[in-house]
A protein has these predicted regions:
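A short glycine-rich, Lys/Arg-flanked "PGG" loop and its adjoining helix->strand segment in the class I
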Residues: 54-66
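Short, acidic, metal-binding catalytic loop of nucleotide-sugar glycosyltransferases
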Residues: 141-153
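Glycine-rich, basic loop-to-helix element that forms the pyrophosphate-binding segment
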Residues: 176-193
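Short aromatic/hydrophobic "clamp" motif used to bind/position activated sugar donors
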Residues: 198
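Conserved donor NDP-sugar-binding/catalytic core segment of glycosyltransferases
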Residues: 212-245
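A recurrent flexible, glycine/aromatic-enriched loop bordering the glycosyltransferase active site
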Residues: 253-274
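Donor nucleotide-sugar recognition loop
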Residues: 269, 281-300, 304-311, 316-317
Length: 366
């Protein structure tokens, strides 16, 4: 059984159904196929009709069975040419594929490794909470919200001072430093995590009662995720954002439409959902302190190493503190990052961030 995902039906063989989906960040074949079930996936002149080629490649791999084939025909354009397609497939899929054919703008891939690691299950989770010992009531509320999810197998790892109630599911990860080394703390949590599915937060989040149900609806086939994050008044609190320009340029940070995606998109440092195997490949830079752009750094390295960050809109977390105000929204554009109009106080906000980073590092270094 296979599927033709081209915009217009090309294949006429009996075992190939046609299912076209307009490419965007929501692209998935989950409504028409089971994961890792298809003998082949065929696409003609779809891969570079938009900027979402990384999402298409990743999704096709998820639904192709072991030994199955992914056949991509491409009409080269300014978004992606044939050589770039081959390079992207190698980067994204790594050692999980064999290239069977690559001539005349036709690429044929064979899947040789399953997507999920052994024992990886949506019913098994390691939650990590970074704390500095303050706001103990917030920390207890977050712990209780996780326990209330009633996940079959889970643990809660706390890195930082904790004097709360002793519970079997709560484990303390020792960290001996007064410096705000949040990246080192996140690495310690991931190192000690029992399960492949990890969710790391700062101690300021409450998990919505349907968070776990939303994760099951999204599915276990992901690398790095954000979920919806809401402020006290239910406005978006940095849940799906982009730097808005090249990493070495002055930022134009703003929110993205949930169905949008950008190569300079990044996840705010307060919450990450990721696989332990991804962390092993791309750990946090332990030398970076809070406020030194550690979220930008790891998001850039995720992208450069071929991991695709997405957002799960079926799950919600509420933040008890959001310091960055309301970001403007980029307009959706399937070819490039859309337009945004920043409010007049944006340069002031950006300058404050630079000053805060400088003063923090100066204080720590004496």
């Amino acid at each position: 059984e296979g599927i033709d995902v081209s915009k217009k039906k090309i294949l006429n063989c009996l075992n190939a159904k046609h299912h076209y989906i307009s490419p965007n960040n929501f692209y998935s074949l989950r409504e028409c196929s089971n994961y890792e079930s298809l003998d082949f996936i065929y696409s003609k002149n779809l891969i570079n009709t938009s900027k979402f080629h990384r999402i298409l490649i990743s999704e096709w791999f998820k639904f192709c069975k072991l030994g199955g084939k992914i056949i991509i025909e491409i009409q080269p354009n300014k978004l992606l040419n044939f050589d770039e397609l081959i390079k992207e497939c190698k980067l994204l899929l790594k050692n999980k594929i064999n290239i069977l054919f690559m001539e005349k703008n036709i690429l044929v891939l064979e899947k040789k490794k399953n997507y999920l690691k052994k024992k990886d299950s949506i019913n098994c989770w390691s939650f990590g909470i970074i704390t500095d010992g303050q706001r103990e009531d917030w920390l207890e509320n977050e712990i209780n919200s996780i326990i209330s999810l009633k996940i079959p197998h889970f643990e809660i790892l706390i890195c930082g001072p904790y004097n709360g109630e002793k519970r079997n599911v709560v484990k303390i990860v020792q960290f001996k430093s007064d410096k705000p080394l949040i990246c080192a703390k996140k690495n310690l949590i991931c190192k000690n995590a029992k399960y492949e599915n990890i969710c790391i937060t700062h101690n300021k989040f409450i998990f919505n009662k349907n968070w776990y149900t939303g994760m099951k609806k999204y599915g276990n086939y992901f690398e790095i995720l954000s979920c919806k994050i809401q402020d006290h008044d239910r406005t978006r609190a940095g849940d799906w954002i982009t730097y808005g320009s090249k990493w070495d340029k002055i930022s134009k940070i703003g929110l993205m439409n949930y169905m949008d995606w950008d190569k300079y998109g990044y996840l705010d440092g307060g919450l990450y959902i990721l696989k332990k195997s991804v962390w092993k490949s791309v750990p946090w830079n332990s030398k970076l302190l809070w406020g030194e752009g550690e979220d930008l750094d790891i998001s850039r390295r995720f992208y450069e190493n071929g991991y695709v960050s997405r957002i799960n809109i079926f799950s919600i977390c509420n933040t008890l503190k959001w310091n960055h105000g309301k970001f403007k929204l980029f307009e959706f554009n399937n070819q490039k990052l859309g337009k945004i109009k920043h409010s007049c106080n944006y340069p002031i906000w950006y300058l404050k961030q630079l000053i805060k980073k400088y003063l923090l590092r100066r204080k720590i270094n004496g």
